[in-house]
Amino acid sequence: MSCADAQDYASQRVRMVAEVEAMYAATRADTGLGAMSPQVRAALAKVERHRFVPAGEQSLAYRNHPLPIGSGQTISQPYIVALSTDLIEPRPGQRVLEIGTGSGYQAAVLAEIVSKVYSIELVPSLGKEAAERLRT
């Protein structure tokens, strides 16, 4: 990846985080959360979502919607990843069990906050690909 690509992805990630933050405000009455917690915001800003989608979807990686990842599965919408992370109130020192690894994006976001993430995936090919991504 070129430096220009990395900068473009970084600016797209900043816009994605801002859009997710706006959705928190718009859904406050339904969720009880008017803003992302600082640790979830930092994790979303740091984890490179484009690494967790197939090459043909990378140009769409920072849009706030789910994307196909193969085997009939999708990577969750960034807002849903942020909201579900905030709702479990993760803290440093905790361990989290995630059921349904998918591409590994949610696990990567959680790993920025908690001490240990255990993730289980039913589809062997997705589990293998996610494990490879999460090792790098």
PLM feature spans:
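Conserved nucleotide-cofactor-binding alpha/beta core module
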Residues: 87-136
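Class I SAM-dependent transferase core
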Residues: 2-97, 113, 128
